[in-house]
């Protein structure tokens, strides 16, 4: 890796400012899934073993820089964090100002402090509107560590401006290092072949950049979900009432043309599970060549498509998956996505990478999160990294000394 990592630092008895991603899903004040907190623990524990004073900063939700709002407080995160660490973690009532400065000053080596939600201040998402915000955060630490991959595609103060105040002292955390290793080396730089990408979700337009980038890398591109229907419509198929992004039909045709010129095999659904609506108790398995009747719409890939996708996965040496292939939240339209999750989890030898977001939720639902090689903690960030080859938040980290 060409960036400084946390293991290159000498943080003993020093204050280390760590940007983590504790933007966890919440409902009624309770955390629904703490994977993002767990994912940050290796870096936190590493720094504590080095007897560093660890200052954690994160955002939660979208309070839009309008000051403290209890529903966006990081207090629920503290309770989970204390459970993992086994000791008290103070929450500074703010991330800047006198109360924050005092909390930082009182922090002893071997202890952890969590600053309150960064996005309570306009200067986090809009650094140009309040340059003093990043400047004050920068004053807290001797070193800076970015372990928030899922936020590093944004040019926000804590991931883009603050690290620039730490020349030679801004490092990637262990989670960030793992993300860059899997997405960079295993997918972009030297993927084992055959390399297969599976893309689902609703829209082509939101993923056209990553599709075009993957056409330079992959041997097989499997397309399903709403995106798959748009490609099928571009080929003149009758899709009934299925979700089609009509404004993206020319994009789809162009992708098919590029794929052909680059010897990339694009595989589209050959059959689907179709129903009148998601509340229907009954569905029909319909061949795409036969055409979906006007009153029905496709909500999942059919058994023949599932079998074909799994066959290609099984013969691949590298697989990347982003976006479900059906409406996985509503059984029985979850079976295609669950089958893909199981195929990835049970593959005996392939490097299998899941690109965050809904695909990560499906893999968790299938009980395969620990069976795949890597589940990215950033949906949008993982796609942008694959498209650009870098992220704003990683570009500003210090270069490796080796």
From Swiss-Prot:
Gene3D superfamilies in alphabetical order? Phosphoglycerate kinase, N-terminal domain
GO MF, one term, reads: ATP binding
- A GO CC annotation given for this chain: cytosol
The record's subcellular location field reads: Cytoplasm
Which enzyme class?
Answer: transferase
Q: List the disulfide bonds.
A: none
Q: Which pathway does the protein contribute to?
A: Carbohydrate degradation; glycolysis; pyruvate from D-glyceraldehyde 3-phosphate: step 2/5
Listed under catalytic activity are: (2R)-3-phosphoglycerate + ATP = (2R)-3-phospho-glyceroyl phosphate + ADP
Q: What is its EC number?
A: 2.7.2.3
Record Pfam families: PGK
Give me the residues that bind ATP, please. 207, 298, 329, 356-359
Q: Which UniProt keywords apply?
A: ATP-binding, Cytoplasm, Glycolysis, Kinase, Nucleotide-binding, Transferase
- What is one GO biological process annotated to this record? gluconeogenesis
HAMAP family according to UniProt: Phosphoglyc_kinase
Recorded protein name is Phosphoglycerate kinase
Organism placement in taxonomy: Bacteria, Pseudomonadati, Chlamydiota, Chlamydiia, Chlamydiales
């Amino acid at each position: 890796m060409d960036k400084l990592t946390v293991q290159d630092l000498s943080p003993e008895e020093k204050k280390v400012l760590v940007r983590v991603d504790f933007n966890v899903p919440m409902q009624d004040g309770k955390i629904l899934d703490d994977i993002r907190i767990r994912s940050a623990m290796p870096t936190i524990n590493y720094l504590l073993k080095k007897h560093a004073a660890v200052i954690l900063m994160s955002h939660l939700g979208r309070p839009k820089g309008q000051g403290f709002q209890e529903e966006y407080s990081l207090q629920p995160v503290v309770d989970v964090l204390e459970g993992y660490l086994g000791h008290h973690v103070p929450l500074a009532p703010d991330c800047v100002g006198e109360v924050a400065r005092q909390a930082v000053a009182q922090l002893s080596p071997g202890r952890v402090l969590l600053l309150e939600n960064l996005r309570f201040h306009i200067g986090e998402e809009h650094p140009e509107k309040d340059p003093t915000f990043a400047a004050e955060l920068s004053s807290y630490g001797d070193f800076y560590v970015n372990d928030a991959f899922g936020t590093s595609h944004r040019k926000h103060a804590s991931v883009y401006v603050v690290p620039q105040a730490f020349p030679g002292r801004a490092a990637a955390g262990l989670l960030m290092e793992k993300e860059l290793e899997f997405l960079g080396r295993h997918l972009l730089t030297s993927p084992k072949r055959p390399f297969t990408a599976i893309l689902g979700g609703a829209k082509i337009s939101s993923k056209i950049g990553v599709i075009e980038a993957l056409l330079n890398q992959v041997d097989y591109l499997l397309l399903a979900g709403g995106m798959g229907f748009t490609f099928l419509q571009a080929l003149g198929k009758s899709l009934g009432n299925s979700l089609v992004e009509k404004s993206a039909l020319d994009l789809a045709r162009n992708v098919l043309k590029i794929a052909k010129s680059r010897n990339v095999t694009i595989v589209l659904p050959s059959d689907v599970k179709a129903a009148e609506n998601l509340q229907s108790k009954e569905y029909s398995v319909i061949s795409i060549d036969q055409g979906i009747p006007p009153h029905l719409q496709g909500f999942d890939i059919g058994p023949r498509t599932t079998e074909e996708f799994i066959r290609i996965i099984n013969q691949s040496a590298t697989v990347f998956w982003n976006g479900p292939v059906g409406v996985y939240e509503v059984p029985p339209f979850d079976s295609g996505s669950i089958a893909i999750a199981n195929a990835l989890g049970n593959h005996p030898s392939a490097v299998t990478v899941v690109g965050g977001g809904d695909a990560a939720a499906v893999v968790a639902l299938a009980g395969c999160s620990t069976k795949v090689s890597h589940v990215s903690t950033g949906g949008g960030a993982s796609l942008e990294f694959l498209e650009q080859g870098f992220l704003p938040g990683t570009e500003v980290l210090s270069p490796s000394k080796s």
